[in-house]
Amino acid sequence: MPPCELISASNGASFQLSDLYFPSFLDLKQFVGETFHISVDDILLLLSYGIILKRSQWDSTKIRSEGLKSIYVFDRKLFNEDIELAVEERFRLFKPLDSPMSDLSEVDRNIVLRNMGWLKALQSDVEFFQLSIEQTRKEVQNMLDCGVVMLEYLKNYCHEVETLYNSHVGFLNKLHEHSASSQWREVYDSVLEAVKIDQQRSLASFFQIDELNQIEAKIRHTDHELNMKLKELKKTIDTCYQHRKTLVSELENIKSISVVSPDCMDKQMTDKFNEMAQELEAASNEWVQNSENNDHISEKVKQMKDSHIPNLQTISQSLFNKASKIIETKTDMQRQLRSLYISVAKSQMDIIEVKSTLTKDMKSDMKLLQTYELQLSQVLDLPMCYGLYLIELYRQQLWMDNYTHIKDQHESALQVMLQEEIHQRKMWYRDFQWISKFLKVDQSLPSTVSITPLKALRRVDLLQINEYFNQLSSAKVSETTLNVLKSKLSQAEMDNMLPELSEQSSNDTGAAIEGYKSRIKKLENLLLDAQFQRYDSWPSGILNKEIAMVQMFRNNTLNNKVQRSSTDDISNSIQQSYSKTLGDVQNLQKAISEYSGLTDTLKEELSTLKSQISNMEVEKNAYKESMANLNKELSNLLINRENFHTEMMERSNDFKKHLALVGEENEQLTKQNQQLSNEIIESQKKYEELNKIKDDLLLNMANQETQAEQERAALQEEIESLKKEVGQLQMAKSSLTESEELLGINKQLEKTLYDVFQGSIFLLESIGLLLSKDIDGKFQIVRVKGLRKDLDSSVIDMNGSLVKSVVSHEIKDTFESIKDSLDYKPHENFISYTEKLFGNQLFEMAVIRRFNDIESLAKKLRKENKNKKILLQKYTNDKITINNFQLGDLALFLPINDQELLLNSSVSSLNSSFSSIDLNSSTQSMIPPRVIPNRVEPASNTNNSNPSSVPEDMGSPNMNRVNTMGNVKVNANIGSNNSNNNYVNTGNANGNNKPETNIDTTSSTNAESPKKQIVWAIFTATNTEVKYILRNTMSNYELLREKEWAVGRITALEKNIVMEGARNPFKFPQNTVWFEVDALFNLS
């Protein structure tokens, strides 16, 4: 058997397991991980045809005996696109070096020795190149085999899911074929409603029509969902199938690109290389050993240097290129296969989702649909089930009648036996009463015998069953159902025939037994009369005890003999009648057993036929499936054949094209050869002519030697002069080319310098600096205000009219003048501008100074903004808000009472302007009028009818507020910007600062006399429709007691709208918006 081989899908490496044994599957995985440097958890092992190797399938001896050839090893990281796997180079190839003799004209001993070392290294390299080509070709084929196995694995997995999907579809189709959802309503209306089970009820009374409708709706909904899910899954399966076909085509493309067939030229080149290397090595050794004595060997080595060494280098270079190319092909194929494996993983994830849906969601939905169908099928099965129910009741009734009849007979027989036993015990007790003194004799027996009767069942007769059958027939129930019910009825009647037969036979036997019993009783009576007639049979006393006992024994013996004889006669007659009856019963039982055996045989044959039919169906489906698979494989083979033919045609066309190219090259070489031959012929002709001329010249040489020498010298001088002129022309041409290139570079540099110069000028003007000239013509950069006014900061137009610098226009004119000028002075003038601006760091220092000024200005402005921000924040914290109050605002709180609202005076108007409330009544606490001494003004100064008496400086820092408290006017100085606010406390006329009464927060009904009620409200200057009232708490009003005004920061706002049923303690009009406010006061 061939050894098993491990093949890695990552790089195509392989390892043979010829003599290795792995007791467990884990040992195999650990060996694979150590061999191919893969983590044990990431190893996936596949067999041929895409079968996964699992722990349960591993048996080293069994697999070895079965002849397992290959195990394909996959690293699970290959299927994860998030993990980058670097392509590992198992070895590197180095380009062969040139021979040390190739560039030398003379050869010595050292050169030959060095060349021999070079030849050994070259032989090793060529051998390595050949080995790497063969090994890489095998690894490429192994990787392609792994790709095929992976696609087979995906195909098997998809086929498994497709089979599961087809089973679900088949199950659903069977449910549709036998579905009760489309039939139950017709059966319910035409059969269940028509068939009556009594005078008031029909079969339809067993169901609730609403529940049946709900079940039908559930069936339709569930069936619709299942169909939609199956359609979606079908789309996914079809997509995976198409994706799988795409992957197969991609693998075929990879094969067509990557497969490198063995080339016979490699072996021929290697053999030729070895042959030439051996010849060169032998000649070199011989030359080294005999270099001083043999010129022939030296000449041979030199010839080999010119012929063998170039060929050796060419062959080694060819093998090197081929090895490098096949390694590069392998690397590209690794990347392509990695993308293929990632696509396989994605396709498998899609099919796994399909499988999960089929095994979980679809399975539960199928069970639910089956349950609903079974519930509706009860409507279809109820007519037959109810008929079977009636037949079962009828059968039980027949059995109950037989049971009752037999029970009554046995009760009468047992009653006779009981009476006889009672009589016998009385007789014995009468004869042997004396022994009861010594022994306990139990004489107790029940007086009657009774068998507990069974509970009575519902009475059903054949008339009711036949009437039910007639109703089913009139309701057009199928004949199959009626035939089944009639057969069950016949079977029930046959089941109760055997007990009747046994009863008849038992009646005959019982009559015979009764006759024999009567005869025995008569004989016992005659015997008893005979005993009474003999005096010696009477019981004796103590004196004649032995005689009496003996006599009694004799009498008992006689009685036993008589009784035995009579019993034998009876038993013989009973035995005869019983044997006859038993024979009849045995005949009947034999017939019944024959019929039952025949029935069992028929049932077995029927079950066998059914099983054969089911097996044939299974085989049929298997044949269909196998035919489908064979058709698929056949189509794949046809596709492969077409692809193969196409590939062969392409190769044939390529070969023909190659032959045509070779033919064309051959023709061209032939033409060249012909041309060379012609040239050789012409050269020979010329040579002959030259020979003739030579002869003529030799003849005339003596005469014209002096003249020729002079002409030669003149020609030599002319040649020398011409050579000098040619050299000068070549130097001029090269210098002209270089000068043109330098001129182009110079123009580009000048353009760049011009752009930099103009950009620098624009940059200076954008920061307010102007480049100008002084009296001496030197550049200077000065600060000019308003220079940036006309510049656009977002657009730089260095050629526009926005630039103000005179130097910019000068250098622009200079640049325009030197574009086509070849004079170097304008160019030097142009460069001088750049040196003046950048040579002495004038530009850098000006920009740095300007930015330092801007930075100091920015720091100054930042400091001023910070101070302004702190001052603004302080002002914001100290300001008093007069409208649109929010949490944290500082507000002015003022007291007001209900009496002020009733006065039509300037004071009430003033209070209305100051406060945001309008009270008709109040539930607040009442305080007495407060008087401020030494601050009373004449009443005439207050015009009650003129509202203009309100002061106009309400918003000023020092504000005078007029508040009416009785007939006294109070002035309050409010400083909003001062840290210590001046509050005015009011007291009574006696100068006491204590108020006359305290704030009462319990109830206003406890006041002894009507007093002014007061609340605290926020001052609003613009919007008087919204009311802001301080919450009535003990802390607030205790804190503000004896205060005329207060400033507090709002901590809470509760919005209220006056509506019917809403809280309105101040009797505001409807739809009035008012806020209940909490505040924090600073009264220090």
Curated annotation (Swiss-Prot):
It is found in: Preautophagosomal structure membrane; Vacuole membrane. Residues 940-949, 973-993 have a biased composition (Low complexity). The keyword Iron-sulfur does not apply. Gene3D superfamilies: 1.10.287.1490. Residues 925-961, 973-1007 are annotated as: Disordered. Signal peptide: none annotated. The keyword Protein transport applies. GO terms for cellular component: Atg1/ULK1 kinase complex; phagophore assembly site membrane; vacuolar membrane. Its main location: membrane. It comes from the Eukaryota. Belongs to the ATG11 family. Involved in cytoplasm to vacuole transport (Cvt), pexophagy, mitophagy and nucleophagy. Recruits mitochondria for their selective degradation via autophagy (mitophagy) during starvation, through its interaction with ATG32. Works as scaffold proteins that recruit ATG proteins to the pre-autophagosome (PAS), the site of vesicle/autophagosome formation. Required for ATG9 anterograde transport from the mitochondria to the PAS. Also recruits the ATG19-prAPE1 complex to the PAS. Required for the Cvt vesicles completion. Homodimer and potential homooligomers. Interacts with ATG1 kinase and the ATG19 and ATG34 cargo protein transporters. Interacts with ATG9, ATG17 and ATG20. PANTHER family: RB1-INDUCIBLE COILED-COIL, RB1-INDUCIBLE COILED-COIL PROTEIN 1. This is Autophagy-related protein 11. It comes from Kluyveromyces marxianus (strain DMKU3-1042 / BCC 29191 / NBRC 104275).
